[in-house]
């Protein structure tokens, strides 16, 4: 099973993906490469060249497969697509290849948690995070992929994730 978390910044993607990777047996956790890349280089805002490198590496991680293992992705192609659309507006073929990444489900995290500041985040306003959340919903619907919106408390989100996986509701 390949599960990806998506949504605006500071919406719980990392918290939930790390948690889920400990809940399921035989799991490979794949972190968000952009954060690793930018923090390692002490970059606050990615340039076009940085973004291209991030896309290339993250997409190679999307193609990572190991038989019988669950793959839990802290981010997905939609995070890269929205970021590109909002900031760079580049034509990158990697951002158009949806079926080949083969995610079984995308969990769209609502921005209903308190925004946590860090050096890489740029949208503290709830209205901006809400606008981006709507953009993610449109992207997911237009791409006709399986997705479930996660909203509510952390426990409610965890419960919905587990019941969705157990019921195979995707």
Where are each of the predicted segments found?
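Pre-Walker A (Motif I) flank of P-loop NTPase domains
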Residues: 1-2
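Hydrophobic anchor at the beta1->P-loop junction of P-loop NTPases
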Residues: 5
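The conserved Walker
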Residues: 9
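Conserved lysine of the Walker
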Residues: 13
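Conserved substrate/cofactor phosphate-moiety recognition/catalytic segment
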Residues: 18-60
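Conserved nucleotide-sensing/catalytic segment adjacent to the nucleotide-binding pocket
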Residues: 43-89
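A glycine- and Lys/Arg-enriched "phosphate-lid" helix/loop adjacent to the NTP-binding pocket
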Residues: 88-156, 160, 169
């Amino acid at each position: 099973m390949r599960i990806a978390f998506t949504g605006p910044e500071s919406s719980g993607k990392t918290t939930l993906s790390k948690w889920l990777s400990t809940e399921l047996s035989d799991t490979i956790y794949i972190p968000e490469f952009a954060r690793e890349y930018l923090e390692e280089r002490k970059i606050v805002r990615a340039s076009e060249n940085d973004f291209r490198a991030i896309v290339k590496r993250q997409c190679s991680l999307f193609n990572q497969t190991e038989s019988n293992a669950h793959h839990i992705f802290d981010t997905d192609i939609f995070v890269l697509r929205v970021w590109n659309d909002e900031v760079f507006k580049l034509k990158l073929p990697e951002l158009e290849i949806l079926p080949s990444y083969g995610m079984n489900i995308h969990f769209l995290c609502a921005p209903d948690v308190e925004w946590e500041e860090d050096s890489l985040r740029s949208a503290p306003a709830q209205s901006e995070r809400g606008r981006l959340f709507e953009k993610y919903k449109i992207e997911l619907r237009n791409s006709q992929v399986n997705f479930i919106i996660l909203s509510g408390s952390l426990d409610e989100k965890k419960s919905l994730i587990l019941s969705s996986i157990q019921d195979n509701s995707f």
